[in-house]
Amino acid sequence: MKPLTLKFITVFTLLLFAAPAWAWHDKTHLAAAKAGGLDSWYNAAGPDLAKIKAGNIESYNHWFNNNAEAEVTVRMVMDQIGRYNQRNKELDSEGHLYGAILASLRAYEKDLRTGKYARYHLAYCVHYLADLSQPLHNIAYDDFNQAFHDRNDGIVESVILDQPHLITRHMYRITLGDETFEEDLAREIARIANLSRYLGYRLRAEKRLMTREEACVQLGHSASLIRAVLRRYP
C-alpha cells in the first residue's frame, strides 16, 4: 500500500471517530450552572451557540473521545490546555474538553488583568464543566455513541430547570487549594472524567440510555465542581 494511501485511510478513520457531538441540552446546562452558583447562569448554554459560527474551533473544546479507553490522569488534563480553541483534526482528533476547562480560566484571568470584561470566560468554563459529566463526551464517538447521544443529552431536559433539587441532592463539597488550584482542579477533572467514561462504557455494553437518576448523579458531579471553582472566581 502506498504511504499516501495509508495516510489518507488513517486520517479518514480519525475523522470518522471525531465527528461533532452535541452536549447536554440548554435547560440542562442552565440548571447545572444555577445549581453550581453561577450568577449569570443564563449564559451557560452560550458555548453551544458559538459552535454555529466558530465550528470546530469551539466544538473540539466540548469533548474528549478517548479512543484508547485510557485512564484519565492529571498529566493528560494538563497536556490538553495548549489545544484550547484549536482545530487540528489530524493531531488532535479526539478533542480536548479537559484542557479547555483550565484554559478558559486562564483566559478569564488574562482578561481580568488587562481590564477587560472577563465574565464570559466563566460561562464557557461552567459549560465545559457540565459537559464533563456527560458520559458520551468521554468515550469514542462510535456507532453506539452516535445512535444514543442526542437522547442522552436530553434525558432530563423537560424537568431539570424547574426541579433543581434533582441536582442539588447529589452535590458534595470539593476543595481546591489556593496554592495548588490548577493541580487540584486537574485532579478533580480526571476523577469525574473517569466516572463519566465508566458509565459510558456501561451504557454501551447494555445498549441503553442513562436513567434520569444516573443523569442527575452525573450533573451533581459537575455542579459540585462548578461550585468549587466559583469559590475562587465569585
Briefly describe each language-model feature range.
Residues 1-9:
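Bacterial N-terminal signal peptides that target proteins for export
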Residues 130, 136-137:
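Short active-site segment of divalent metal-dependent hydrolases/proteases
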Residues 118-126, 130:
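Short alpha-helix carrying the canonical HExxH Zn2+-binding catalytic motif
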Residues 9-17:
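Bacterial N-terminal signal peptides
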Residues 19-120, 138-234:
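N-terminal, motif-rich segments that launch catalysis or mediate targeting to/interaction with membranes
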